[in-house]
Amino acid sequence: MRRLETLESILERLRMSIKKNGLKNSKQREEVVSVLYRSGTHLSPEEITHSIRQKDKNTSISSVYRILNFLEKENFICVLETSKSGRRYEIAAKEHHDHIICLHCGKIIEFADPEIEHRQNEVVKKYQAKLISHDMKMFVWCKECQESDD
């Protein structure tokens, strides 16, 4: 999915958010955001920690979890719960998209479908509601898992 913001712009917003919350600036927070931005995919806390440890051996998994909680609360990242691979994170500054999640291997596929978006808006209109947000996840067995199960 196309990015809606540059990494530098996100980091600048992060610095303002840290200041607004009365926290000290932390290179680790910026590094977590950078790892997620550059990955372009959904990462687990362990994968994020491993990536950061390539530069900073002192990074702990507990610090990464605390940072992820803060980033989620401040809407810098989105969390995706999968039964197979646990919580996975992605940068929030992307075009709207939905997810297909394989229940067998945990693979995550991002997609955008204008017809589905249109239909969701029609449903909202039918009930005279105001759509604030939505998050669609379809749980499947991916092609590879279907083939390996045969």
From Swiss-Prot:
Compartments reported by the entry: Cytoplasm
Q: Which residues bind Zn(2+)?
A: H42, E90, H99, C102, C105, E110
Spell out the CDD domains in the cross-references. Fur_like
Mention one GO biological process in which this protein takes part, according to its record.
regulation of DNA-templated transcription
Instruction: Tell me the residue numbers annotated for binding Fe cation.
Output: H96, D98, E117, H134
Sorted keywords for this record are: Cytoplasm, DNA-binding, Iron, Metal-binding, Repressor, Transcription, Transcription regulation, Zinc
Signal sequence range: none
Which residues lie within the region annotated Dimerization? 94-150
Where are the annotated segments for DNA-binding?
A: 1-93
Q: Main location per UniProt?
A: cytoplasm
The record's GO CC annotations read:
cytosol
One Gene Ontology term of the molecular function aspect: transcription cis-regulatory region binding
Q: Which family does it belong to?
A: Belongs to the Fur family.
The subunit structure is:
Homodimer.
**Function of the protein:** Acts as a global negative controlling element, employing Fe(2+) as a cofactor to bind the operator of the repressed genes.
Q: What is this protein called?
A: Ferric uptake regulation protein
Lineage summary? Bacteria, Pseudomonadati, Campylobacterota, Epsilonproteobacteria, Campylobacterales
* Encoding gene (name): fur
